[in-house]
Amino acid sequence: MSLTRKRGFYKQDINKTAWELPKTYLAPAHVGSGAYGAVCSAIDKRTGEKVAIKKLSRPFQSEIFAKRAYRELLLLKHMHHENVIGLLDVFTPASSLRSFHDFYLVMPFMQTDLQKIMGMEFSEDKVQYLVYQMLKGLKYIHSAGIVHRDLKPGNLAVNEDCELKILDFGLARHTDTEMTGYVVTRWYRAPEVILSWMHYNQTVDIWSVGCIMAEMLTGKTLFKGKDYLDQLTQILKVTGVPGAEFVQKLKDKAAKSYIQSLPQSPKKDFTQLFPRASPQAADLLDKMLELDVDKRLTAAQALAHPFFEPFRDPEEETEAQQPFDDALEHEKLSVDEWKQHIYKEISNFSPIARKDSRRRSGMKLQ
């Protein structure tokens, strides 16, 4: 056996890729892969639980990849909330920094995501329960000083009992970091992100929740723009073209003159726009799909909306114990330096028992 590898690991080809796993994880099976890594499911023999294991794709290929891998590890480590995906374990088969090339993230296994089931009929109580969980997760994330910025149905994992977790913090950034306009899938993207037209904050995620909730209620994507301008046009058809008070908040001159060139129009009546929704659901959507970020609901305000009364438990609407601190966010480090930081994080990691909710809704997805 190679002295550069740890004992207690075994090799297995999964979907034409070599994986090296500790013997505590049994029956690995391919789940999916994307630009930044592949995921397999496995059984943790210590608990009997099914877990998801992510192998990052070439994490040390470049400074950008290495920094991204470090940030993903740190963010997952920071998350301790039942509606946010967090880290159960992290490991590397390497026994020293010199032989360290790959590492694996272990997370709770989730059966599907909202994207895959968006075509199904959602009853209003299912919408209540799922959106309530999205907002609980966001309240927690936002309290840590993090904006998700990429919230869309594919980033919302669900189990058959309607339990939901927010995924994918690869593109999340600290609120006080300069934000760029190319993040959320366009259809779920807040208008202030599309145009970078004004300062924006954590309520970009609330806009995304509004778009997702509307789609769950109607079975159709609310703002299905073909490009940026078409996206904005579709949004303004619903929100109305704003007046002078809003326009003077815009920092971007081109956006200012474009909005001023349009004839002013009122906001649509959301009870007419969503005829199948209850008045409370329409009212919540109206307040989440607010053009002015200063008037849009925060996650905490949205949770207090009467729409969630049947499921609400304020004790479960927890905040992060401390803000997320990524002291290296602005550092320009070499691949080797990022590698050292990641190796140290892995070596120092001690798993924390994750507590999920005491109560269950009794609902089933299908």
Curated annotation (Swiss-Prot):
It catalyses: L-seryl-[protein] + ATP = O-phospho-L-seryl-[protein] + ADP + H(+); L-threonyl-[protein] + ATP = O-phospho-L-threonyl-[protein] + ADP + H(+). One of its GO terms (biological process) is response to osmotic stress. The active site is at residue 150. The keyword Transferase applies. The keyword Phosphoprotein applies. The modification Phosphoserine is found at residue 350. Its cofactor is Mg(2+). Residues 25-308 form the Protein kinase domain. It comes from the Eukaryota. GO terms for cellular component: nucleoplasm. ATP binds at residues 31-39, 54. The modification Phosphothreonine is found at residue 180. The modification Phosphotyrosine is found at residue 182. A motif (TXY) lies at residues 180-182. Activated by phosphorylation on threonine and tyrosine by dual specificity kinases, MAP2K3/MKK3, MAP2K6/MKK6, MAP2K4/MKK4 and MAP2K7/MKK7. Activation by ultraviolet radiation, hyperosmotic shock, anisomycin or by TNF-alpha is mediated by MAP2K3/MKK3. Inhibited by dual specificity phosphatase DUSP1. Keywords: ATP-binding, Cell cycle, Kinase, Nucleotide-binding, Phosphoprotein, Serine/threonine-protein kinase, Stress response, Transcription, Transcription regulation, Transferase. It is an enzyme of class 2 (transferase). GO terms for molecular function: ATP binding; MAP kinase activity; protein serine kinase activity; protein serine/threonine kinase activity. Its EC number is 2.7.11.24. Pfam families: Pkinase. Interacts with MAPK8IP2. Serine/threonine kinase which acts as an essential component of the MAP kinase signal transduction pathway. MAPK13 is one of the four p38 MAPKs which play an important role in the cascades of cellular responses evoked by extracellular stimuli such as pro-inflammatory cytokines or physical stress leading to direct activation of transcription factors such as ELK1 and ATF2. Accordingly, p38 MAPKs phosphorylate a broad range of proteins and it has been estimated that they may have approximately 200 to 300 substrates each. MAPK13 is one of the less studied p38 MAPK isoforms. The TXY motif contains the threonine and tyrosine residues whose phosphorylation activates the MAP kinases. Belongs to the protein kinase superfamily. CMGC Ser/Thr protein kinase family. MAP kinase subfamily. This is Mitogen-activated protein kinase 13. It comes from Mus musculus.
